[in-house]
């Protein structure tokens, strides 16, 4: 049954203040949330958009220790960087605060105390890893070791970043402390737990029966958790950074970040509206919508609702539109590996192109499955869609109006059937876009908005007003009137998606404001209305610009490979006599050329001190022939001849293979006589 609400509270997952925001965050959470909020505002609905930085937790303390600074220094640096980046990118929060604020500390403490006083927690003693050298308990991220699944080194106590498997600290092979490097021991510690099993019955009814409209990925993950049976979850941990547990006997313990962070939505609202914040969180006529990534589904659909229900006075979320993950050039985005497109760097590299990234991220939104961002696709969507379709139509309509009517909107004359069909097409767009936005299908909604521009381009191409200018100006006026009405509709339809471009278009059209209710109308611009000078809405992005971004990623990949380089294991021992069978010599390269129809092969003529011999080597992708002429190389002289591409090769040139697959020919450190033995 359709529920009617007076207002909507929209939250977006609090970004972790231990690094900048990247495109995965934008595609998964912030762009869709901003589209939805802008849409509601255009409809004149009462909406509040809440954001803020999550400033507690282990990764922040780890970074602080690595850099030799305080956790507060870390969060101060990244909170302001993230906030500034969001502002420049057009994420239109009503408030963007932080969980280190006094308001948040007070509200989170009060929330915990109320649940504690109501008997909603249980106390449990458990064993946890302890660093005897550092004299502290180790949280998940303070423990590293070998992953039991893929056997890569450096897996964390909660997850292996190599294979993505969720782990427990005790799963790791050869665990060690990230603080001291020593082997940790198990030690008893006491913590408070939220007994989720106590809430399982009502959660099952509330989610599985009352919210079947949730996205399949959200509904499915919740059902999986519920079917496995919910377990008590710790709400405190041993750490010196965070909100102290506000009860006696809790010295050295803070609220677990998963408990503290979602309360940040409420405290940020209170900071903005100290006198009316409860209306947005406790009134049943308020709709609560959480925008999150899939790694936060359990916290926002099961844990946080259980907290709110246990407290007793808060509303529960009505919808939790969670996205899957966005990958980058076929690889998982990773902060620790620097494999990301960072928002603040994008804003520097592409000034004035916020909407291009918004458009591409929405077009590739991982709404139902993981999706991939590539720089080539970014360029193609800009050049082939924003420039060639949307921008081209707007520019043609505006320029032709300037040329034939001095920039004034011409009156529409008698309409032919094709005019009426075109007007009918774009009048239907409002209902379709609205239907899609209401169910959080932002990718399809944007595609529908772009169809308006396609309609306009086709209409201008079919009617060819430039050919009628000498014979039928009334008809030209009608065509351009209809085209300009389409342009005005585009400005409204794209405002939630491309706010910067819509604002520029509004100024070009000399319109006062936008109203969603006007979308689909064919009289937005009255006859005689003066337009401003047309400008290009979008610019073509050249290959060199994209190649620079791709190279930046390749450099990152190379740096990661070098940092993680590990030599291959030494092979089994051989007898000395077996080694002595190899005759390794130094030869001087006399000639070198590519082997026809063979991408990898070079043909050498080598002076081996006794005669000239031919050797074929698979190093053509690593050296140009002229680089090796005159050089001395090491080769195996007594290898049985072998025919390659019709050429008899009389030996093997020795090369060292780097960790990136590149080859380096083995050469003597100083010149020796051709034929010298390598011993």
Curated annotation (Swiss-Prot):
Tell me one GO molecular function of this protein.
tRNA binding
Task: Please indicate which superkingdom the organism of origin belongs to.
Answer: Bacteria
Paste the cofactor note: Binds 1 zinc ion per subunit.
Could you say which residues bind ATP here?
335
GO biological process assignments: methionyl-tRNA aminoacylation
Q: Where in the cell is it found?
A: Cytoplasm
Motif 'KMSKS' region location, chain numbering = 332-336
- Report the residue ranges where the short sequence motif 'HIGH' region is annotated in this entry: 15-25
| A single Gene Ontology CC term | cytosol
Chief place of localization: cytoplasm
Does Signal show up as a keyword for this record? no
Record key words, sorted: Aminoacyl-tRNA synthetase, ATP-binding, Cytoplasm, Ligase, Metal-binding, Nucleotide-binding, Protein biosynthesis, RNA-binding, tRNA-binding, Zinc
Which cofactor does the UniProt annotation name? Zn(2+)
Which residues are noted in the entry as Zn(2+)-binding? 147, 150, 160, 163
Q: Does the keyword Zinc apply?
A: yes
Annotated signal sequence is none
Q: Which reaction does it catalyse?
A: tRNA(Met) + L-methionine + ATP = L-methionyl-tRNA(Met) + AMP + diphosphate
Its Enzyme Commission number? 6.1.1.10
A Pfam family matched in the record = tRNA_bind
List, for all copies, the residue spans of the domain called tRNA-binding. 578-679
Q: Share what the entry says about its subunit structure, partners included.
A: Homodimer.
What role is this protein assigned? Is required not only for elongation of protein synthesis but also for the initiation of all mRNA translation through initiator tRNA(fMet) aminoacylation.
Q: What does the sequence similarity comment in the record state about its family? A: Belongs to the class-I aminoacyl-tRNA synthetase family. MetG type 1 subfamily.
State what protein this is by name: Methionine--tRNA ligase
The top of its lineage is: Bacteria, Pseudomonadati, Bacteroidota, Bacteroidia, Bacteroidales
